[in-house]
């Protein structure tokens, strides 16, 4: 197999290129090397997510054409103030506040605030077997809720970008931290909706400091 280093710097302002350069230096110091990606380049460029906006737009428009995307005007403080349940990774399960807005309501809200955009998920259980953690099931609507696809400033969400990138780069196995286990069901569902073949997932325990 081949190891791909993908730089997930969707928010270019918060993730300047020097951070990616430092990451490569740290990996080299640890004796970890990759076959393609990062500054090394390779056959599946671009490897920096900040350079892939046009690619993500194509998949975004496909989901939009399916009637699965809608504008959301909720602020983070409003969501946390609501007595909504939380996901296993600590985020608020979106209660669907803006899901049923009419065209007139959307137009009125746009006068005051630019919306972010969410993906409408079904009330469906997604089950998969993780290579390290074993069987895992989550209900998309109850345990996750409609999630962000694109921020109000136009930056695409991680949850969309990684699915598109994995497919275009021919990724067959994903090894990552257990903190992303709960993201996998919604990503698997998105692979299906976009007609893509998902990779196998392996979630490893995190290495944490004593404090």
Please describe what each predicted stretch is.
Residues 1-87, 178-179, 183-196:
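N-terminal Rossmann-like or analogous alpha/beta NTP/dinucleotide-binding catalytic cores
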Residues 77-211:
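Active-site cores that bind ATP or allylic diphosphates and position pyrophosphate for catalysis
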């Amino acid at each position: 197999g081949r190891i791909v280093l993908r730089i997930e710097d969707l928010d270019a302002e918060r993730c300047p290129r020097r951070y990616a350069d430092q990451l490569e230096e740290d990996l080299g110091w640890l004796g970890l090397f990759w076959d393609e990606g990062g500054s090394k380049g390779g056959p599946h460029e671009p490897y920096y997510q900040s350079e892939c906006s046009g690619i993500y737009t194509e998949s975004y428009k496909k989901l939009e054409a399916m009637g699965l995307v809608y504008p959301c005007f909720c602020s983070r403080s409003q969501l946390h103030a609501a007595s909504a349940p939380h996901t296993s990774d600590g985020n608020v399960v979106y209660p669907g506040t803006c899901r049923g807005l009419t065209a007139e309501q959307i137009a009125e809200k746009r006068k005051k605030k630019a919306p972010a955009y969410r993906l409408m998920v079904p009330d469906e259980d997604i089950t998969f077997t993780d290579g390290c953690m074993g069987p895992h099931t989550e209900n998309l609507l109850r345990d996750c809720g409609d999630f962000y696809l694109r921020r109000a400033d136009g930056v695409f969400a991680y949850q969309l970008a990684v699915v598109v990138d994995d497919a275009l780069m021919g990724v067959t196995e994903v090894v990552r931290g257990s903190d992303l286990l709960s993201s996998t069901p919604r990503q698997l569902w998105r692979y299906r909706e976009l007609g893509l073949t998902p990779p196998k997932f392996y979630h490893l325990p995190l290495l944490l400091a004593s404090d």
